[in-house]
Structures are given as C-alpha cells and as structure tokens.
Regions:
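Membrane interfacial helix-start motif at the N-side
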Residues: 42-43, 117-127, 283-303
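Membrane-interface helix-loop junction between the first two transmembrane segments
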Residues: 16-37
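Membrane-embedded catalytic scaffold of the fatty acid hydroxylase/desaturase
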Residues: 43-52, 74-230
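Core segments of transmembrane alpha-helices
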Residues: 51-56, 128-136, 303-314
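Juxtamembrane/interfacial segments at transmembrane-helix boundaries in multi-pass membrane proteins
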Residues: 58-81
C-alpha cells in the first residue's frame, strides 16, 4: 500500500506549523517563490504516475515468478523488518549513485535545486526517477519479499524523510548515530566543499558511517543550500530536464565519438575536454553564494497559487478515485 496519499494532509499541516513557528521566532525559512517551485515539482511527481508505464513493475513481476526465492510471509514481523532494512540499503546506493553518475543525477537534481531548506523541500521530487531507479530494488524481489511489502516500506521510508527537511531542529544526541536526522540531512543538501556528496541514507545513517560517506554538521561551517550549477529559474520543466539537456548538448558538440557515449555514463561533473574548453561553465563559490530571488508581481503570485491549489485538488481527486477503484476490484 502506498501510504504517501494518506500522509498529504499531515504534510500540509506540518508546513503551515513550520512557517508559523519560523515567523514567530523571527527565523523564517520560507520564500514564496522557492516554496511554490518545490510544491509544483511535488505535484508533478505525483501526477506523473498517471501517464507513465512501469517497465520496472513488469521486470519485478518476471523476477517474482521465475527467479526469486520463495515468497516470504507478509504477515510475519521478520519480513517487514528485513524489508525495511534492505529497502534503505538499496535506497542508499541509488541515492549515492544518483549524485555520482550524471545520468542518475539528472533525475535526482530537482530535489536539490531549492536554495532554502524547509518542509516544502522534502516534497520537491523528481518526475523522471522511475526511468532507472527501479533497477536498484531488484534484490528485494530476488530474496522473495512480497511486492505489497516493498511498496509499503518504500512509502514509509519516503514519509520518514519528510520531517528531516527543517532548519529548526538541532542535533538529537544518540539518535544521530543510527538514523537520518535534520542535522545530518542538512549536510546532504549543502554545496559547501566539506559537505558535498555526503549522508545518503534515507532512514538509517549507518550506511554512510559504514561506507565512508558520513559528514557531521559543523557549527563553524554554516550550510549553504542548493546546487553548484544554480538553476536560476522557476520553470518546472526546466528544473526536471536541464541536466538531460546539458548531457545531450555536450554529446552532440564533442568531436570524440567515445566522449559522445561517455557523457551518458560519466561521473557527475565530467565533460568532454573540447566542449569544456569552448563552453566553460560558471564556477560557484559557496562562500559568496547569492540566492536566486527575483521579484514576482503580486497578481502573478496569486494566479500561480490558484493554479497550484487547483492542481492539488485535482490530483487528490484522481488519487482517491484510483484507491476506490482498487478497493472495488479487490472486493
């Protein structure tokens, strides 16, 4: 069961509470333009499910039928504990390679484009992650974890990650050693040199400690949020596609046929030498970083807000209809 649909009202309430708290203590972490952009991308990521075909789902079915170990008992507690741990392990490697390989970063980058850090950032999700992300969860089906368990623990993992996107909670003592927290996840969203590409866990931070990717948040190094190549746009289509466009452009322009292919499997940040020389990209110094914050006229903001609310209501209607249909079929 996908529990994210049921969590949406809690998400909205929590965002309003965080906003009110920030205003009350004179430490507001919200900007209308940035928050709207994050929420719009979140809506698109959910709407995408209605218009795409799941290649991954078909592969999972084939694995379950022909290649997996005997299915585990979905009513046994051990199945759920194993699934929760294994899901986060698979997520760690998807997340890590999502930063280290350009083709995967192209899908994940949308989540990191926000230059603020608040609960709307948690909802800033990709709409293209389904293209390759499913590959990393194949081990769960190979060991015989039932599909309904995988989907449920996946939604629990995602819901857990919501609350860690806040600047208002400090370090949490012993909890920091085992689980992902606001402090160690703030590090993950930073573009500071010392923090870059660290803390990939979704539920457990233990993977980062085990595989050498952990970095503690330091008082002397305030976090600078965002990406090294700022988007400088509120256009959601550009937010979702700009890395793909950059890869295609570099592949087209380079004269070396090997580099034309290498672009698509390279480490994040790599570019063909001839293209990098003829079309260098702006280098960002986090120490002097200035947030993208153009003034948006009031009427435009109101119209955009109206569109967002309408989209959320329509999406909620479609998801409820989908749930009702599924329950009807089950009966």
């Amino acid at each position: 069961m996908n529990l994210v649909v049921y969590a949406v009202p809690i998400f909205i309430l929590a965002i309003l509470v965080e906003l009110a708290y920030g205003l009350a203590v004179h430490r507001n972490t919200y900007r209308l333009n940035d928050s709207f952009s994050s929420l719009a991308l979140g809506v698109l990521s959910q709407a995408r499910r209605f218009v795409t075909l799941g290649v991954g789902g078909y592969v999972y079915h084939l694995i379950t039928v022909y290649f997996s170990l005997p299915l585990m008992d979905a009513s046994h507690w051990f199945t759920w504990v194993l699934a929760m741990v294994l899901y986060d392990f698979c997520y760690y490697w998807l997340h890590r390679l999502g930063h280290e390989r350009t083709i995967l970063w192209a899908a994940h980058v949308a989540h990191h484009q926000s230059e603020d850090y608040n609960l709307t950032t948690a909802l800033r999700q990709t709409s293209t992650g389904f293209l390759l992300g499913w590959i990393f969860y194949i081990p769960m089906y190979l060991v015989g974890i039932p599909a309904e368990v995988v989907v449920t623990v996946g939604s629990i993992n995602l819901i857990y990650q919501f609350w860690v996107h806040t600047e208002h909670l400090p370090k949490l003592g012993w909890y920091e050693w085992i689980f992902v927290t606001p402090s160690n996840h703030r590090v993950h969203h930073a573009q500071n040199d010392i923090y870059l590409d660290r803390n990939y866990g979704g539920l457990f931070i233990l993977w980062d400690r085990l595989f050498g990717t952990f970095q503690e948040e330091l008082d002397e190094e305030p976090v600078v949020y965002g990406i090294r190549g700022p988007l400088k746009s509120w256009n959601p289509v550009r937010a979702l596609t700009h890395i793909y466009v950059d890869m295609a452009r570099d592949s087209w322009r380079t004269a070396d046929w090997r580099d034309k292919l290498r672009v698509w499997v390279s480490r994040t940040g790599w570019r063909p030498a001839d293209v990098a020389a003829s079309d260098p990209r702006e280098k960002i110094d986090p120490a002097h970083f200035v947030k993208y914050d153009p003034r948006v006229p009031g009427p435009v903001s109101l119209y955009a807000l109206f569109q967002l609310v309408a989209a959320v209501l329509l999406l909620n209607f479609m998801e409820n209809a989908e749930l009702a249909y599924g329950q009807g079929v089950a009966l």
